[in-house]
UniProtKB/Swiss-Prot annotation:
Post-translational events: In normoxia, is probably hydroxylated on Pro-405 and Pro-530 by EGLN1/PHD1, EGLN2/PHD2 and/or EGLN3/PHD3. The hydroxylated prolines promote interaction with VHL, initiating rapid ubiquitination and subsequent proteasomal degradation. Under hypoxia, proline hydroxylation is impaired and ubiquitination is attenuated, resulting in stabilization.
The bHLH domain, residue ranges: 14-67
Provenance organism: Rattus norvegicus (Rat)
SUPFAM superfamilies in UniProt: HLH, helix-loop-helix DNA-binding domain, PYP-like sensor domain (PAS domain)
Positions carrying Phosphothreonine: 844
Encoding gene (name): Epas1
Protein name: Endothelial PAS domain-containing protein 1
Modified residues (4-hydroxyproline): 405, 530
Region (CTAD), start-end ranges: 834-874
């Protein structure tokens, strides 16, 4: 039994050994056959000896198909010479790409050996493989369209022959880096290849062989040359003189251009910036350039075909452009387009104009010829040049538009000669004599006469040196014409340039002491920052404007000045200026004389010394001129001011130095400007600083708001009796003036310029201080009888103030308050009855500074800033 088992094992092992030997023999024979086949391939021995069987079969099949293609394409009689064999090696070196042959199924049956130079992949690695394994998936559809004969965009005959020309772009895997290194296929990047070639059709079998009458279908393959597009940043070879660089935005607008375009095409680089490249393409090439732009945005690189770019002076040049999209390294978003433009020809057909830009360029040559006419350096007679210019302008009338001067240019008269033109008698009537100056020169020397000849918009208003009362009419140092005809002179029909310049000119600085005339016409009161009170009560801005006509007293108009800056409306008002102009404008019938009287009233001159010592000039303005905000055009007038009475009114500190606001009844005695008592001279400097029109400090917005509130309350107080007659009752100063002084003390505190210094004796004459307060508060003088000045004042002392006597009237006589009031002190003043039905908010300087507008702006504290400022104040 054991022997039989051993025999069976030996026989099975022998059969296995024989089978293994047979398989080994077959494999060795196959290997020999494959190696023999590999040696038959047109490959170096070092390459073919390391090929596997699959690669050998793949390469052999590709070789056979390529040979069949060549045999069908080339004729049998053609014999390859030795010279042609030598040239084959030079072809690959000269080409800037590689050659590929792709079947209609997508198999690459042939690739030139220089493909490794551009793509990093060798010829053996790619030959026999499908092209779809190494190209971008987004390009597969386009590749299939170009592999077949059904579709294609070429130059074949329409409706007769199918187009076989191919020109497209595809992205293929590249394993070579910019530095020349070769990476793995998994780390390969995409490189754009410009593929140009044609589709060739050939028979699978030779023509003489037939298989029982059966004909195999025709085979087709695509023979293309693939050229990679070099990145502009990787160019090592310098550009020649026929090449220029340009940079564009993504919509092909020029952002940079090389200077060489000036010599090649004629454009200056500055002329192209911001303009689209499509403006310079020939109309016949616009479709191809649009397609190239689409490929550029899709694939990142493109090479345009040969196209025509319009030259500047007519004609065109042939160009070819390589475009590359530059991406932002941070977010990988397209940033710009870099173009390398190769000029392929000189300017062709430079006499053909196909663009409007070229017409402008051509007209520039004519203009250059025109400019040479005015060149006096040539020896050619001026008449000949004029004749030449006249001929050119007659042939090309459109060139006259190029000669039109721009505003500010010097106007050069064209002299065409007298033989070509007859002087018209129409223009001879308005020509000035040779020795007589032009009307513009006459106007420059006679500005005073113009102001009288054109008085329609001119409202002369003369004021004192401290006069800063806002005016509702526009007044300037120059006259403003009232109609369009006034802008022209009577002698010629030219514009009055000086009048127009003065019309739009504004003085930025005051030229003299009478230049602080403000103008509400040029102001937008809504943009002015209002005062925000601390107690929540709002004060509206009320305009102050003259309504009744004024009677000019001085025959010579004083120089006027327009309102210069917006912030000057907050300038402090001087005594006799804040309400003085208003008083003079509203009640001019009491201002018929300006004689200085020897009688004066016992009032402090701290309300007058801030201004000039000279007499007040008359106000010669037309008070009925309406307020205008449309460049001097008359529109809605302001309402007239109601008459004022000394009733329970709300006084503004900013008007303490103002003029009396009440009208003087007929028969009222004239007033005298007061003199300065010795014990109140210490307040002159402070009053002048706080209330002077030329002072450095501006009035607080609170004062302006309170002054405007006074205007609103006049209407309410109009029906109330103002004062009882002094002949039938107690003097009004015995009670009201003292209470008003208490009110002023509670309002101003220590910051009021009217507050007496603590060092001053309490037994000082209260009538002087009270009358000073009443004088500053602008009490009306309507219902007051004339009063006689005290005998304690000397005429010489009172003559120091040179103000017109008829402009001022004191409603009080010389008196002294009761002793109980004088000795009660501050407590009794605070606890005493109020002169008014309600109290004004007591504002500190810090509260006013919080809400005062910033210089040069109208921004107020709002929101958190206002709350923060209020917290700091508390």
């Amino acid at each position: 039994m054991t022997a039989d088992k051993e025999k069976k094992r030996s026989s099975s092992e022998l059969r296995k050994e024989k089978s293994r030997d047979a398989a080994r023999c077959r494999r060795s024979k196959e290997t020999e056959v494959f190696y023999e086949l590999a040696h038959e391939l047109p490959l170096p021995h070092s390459v073919s000896s390391h090929l596997d069987k699959a690669s050998i079969m793949r390469l052999a099949i590709s070789f056979l198909r390529t040979h069949k293609l060549l045999s069908s394409v080339c004729s049998e009689n053609e014999s390859e010479a030795e010279a042609d064999q030598q040239m084959d090696n030079l072809y690959l070196k000269a080409l800037e790409g590689f050659i590929a042959v792709v079947t209609q199924d997508g198999d690459m049956i042939f690739l030139s050996e220089n493909i490794s130079k551009f793509m990093g992949l060798t010829q053996v690695e790619l030959t026999g493989h499908s092209i779809f394994d190494f190209t971008h998936p987004c390009d597969h559809e386009e590749i299939r369209e170009n592999l077949t004969l059904k579709t294609g965009s070429g130059f074949g005959k329409k409706n007769k022959d199918r187009s076989t020309e191919r020109d497209f772009f595809m992205r293929m895997k590249c394993t070579v880096t910019n530095r020349g290194r070769t990476v793995n296929l998994k780390s390969a990047t995409w490189k754009v290849l410009h593929c140009t070639g044609q589709v060739r059709v050939y028979n699978n079998c030779p023509p003489h062989s037939s298989l029982c009458g059966y004909k195999e279908p025709l085979l087709s393959c695509l023979i293309i040359m693939c050229e990679p597009i070099q990145h502009p940043s990787h160019m090592d070879i310098p550009l020649d003189s026929k090449t220029f660089l340009s940079r564009h935005s993504m919509d092909m607008k020029f952002t940079y251009c090389d200077d060489r375009i000036l010599e090649l095409v004629g454009y200056h680089p500055e002329e192209l910036l911001g303009r689209s490249a499509y403006e310079f393409y020939h109309a016949l090439d616009s479709e191809n350039m649009t397609k190239s732009h689409q490929n550029l945005c899709t694939k990142g690189q493109v090479v345009s075909g040969q196209y025509r770019m319009l030259a500047k002076h007519g004609g065109y040049v042939w160009l070819e452009t390589q475009g590359t999209v530059v991406y932002n390294p941070r977010n990988l978003q397209p940033q710009c387009i870099m173009c390398v433009n190769y000029v392929l020809s000189e300017i062709e057909k430079n006499d053909v104009v196909v663009s409007m830009d070229q017409t402008e360029s051509c007209s520039s040559h004519t203009l250059m010829a025109m400019n040479s006419i005015f060149d006096t350096s040539d020896d050619v007679a001026l008449s000949e040049k004029s004749n030449y210019l006249f001929t050119n302008l007659k042939e090309e009338p459109e060139d006259l538009a190029q000669l039109a001067p721009t505003p500010g240019d010097a106007i050069i008269s064209l002299d065409f000669g007298s033989q070509n033109f007859d002087e018209s008698s129409t223009y001879g009537k308005a020509i000035l004599p040779p020795g007589q100056p032009w009307a513009t020169e006459l106007r420059s020397h006679s500005a005073q006469s113009e102001s009288r000849s054109l008085p329609a918009f001119t409202v002369p208003q003369a004021g004192s040196p401290g006069n800063a009362t806002p005016s509702a009419t526009s007044s300037s140092s120059c006259s403003t014409p009232s109609s369009p005809e006034d802008y022209y002179s009577s002698l010629e029909n030219h514009l009055k340039i000086e009048v127009i310049e003065k019309l739009f000119a504004m003085d930025t600085e005051a030229k003299d002491q009478c230049s602080t005339q403000t103008d509400f016409n040029e102001l937008d009161l809504e943009t002015l920052a209002p005062y925000i009170p601390m107690d929540g009560e709002d004060f509206q801005l009320s305009p102050i404007c003259p309504e009744e006509p004024l009677v000019p007293e001085s025959p010579q108009p004083n120089p006027q000045h327009c309102f210069s800056t917006m912030s000057s409306i907050f300038q402090p008002l001087t005594p006799g200026a804040s309400q003085g102009t208003f008083f003079l404008d509203k009640y001019p019938q009491q201002l018929e004389s300006r004689k200085t009287e020897s009688e004066h009233w016992p009032m402090s001159t701290i309300f007058f010394d801030a201004g000039s010592k000279g007499s007040l000039p008359p106000c010669c303005g037309q008070a009925s001129t309406p307020l205008s905000s449309m460049g001097g055009r008359s529109n809605t007038p302001w309402p007239p001011d109601p008459p004022l009475h000394l009733g329970p009114t709300k006084w503004s500190v900013g008007n303490q130095s103002a003029e009396p606001l009440g009208p003087l009844p007929l028969g009222t005695s004239q007033l005298e400007p007061p003199s300065t008592p010795p014990h109140v001279s210490m307040f002159k400097m402070r009053s002048a600083k706080d209330f002077g029109a030329r002072g450095p400090y501006m009035m607080s917005p609170a004062m302006i708001a309170l002054s405007n509130k006074l205007k609103l309350k006049r209407q309410l107080d109009y029906e109330e009796p103002a004062f009882q007659d002094t002949s039938g009752g107690d003097p009004p100063g015995t009670s009201s003036s003292h209470l008003m002084w208490k009110r002023m003390k509670s309002l101003m505190g220590g910051t009021c310029p009217l507050m007496p210094d603590k060092t001053v004796s309490a037994s000082m004459a209260p009538d002087e201080f009270t009358q000073k307060s009443m004088r500053g508060l602008g009490q009306p003088l309507r219902h007051l009888p004339p009063s006689q000045p005290p005998s304690t004042r000397s005429p010489g002392e009172n003559a120091k103030s040179g103000f017109p006597p008829q402009c001022y009237a004191s409603p009080f006589q010389d008196y002294s308050p009761p002793g109980a009031q004088k000795g009660s002190g501050v407590a009794s003043r605070l606890l005493g009855p109020s002169f008014e039905p309600y109290l004004l908010p007591e504002l500190t300087r810090y509260d006013c500074e919080v809400n005062v507008p910033e210089p040069g702006s109208s921004t107020l504290l709002q929101g958190r800033d206002l709350l923060r400022a209020l917290d700091q104040a508390t």
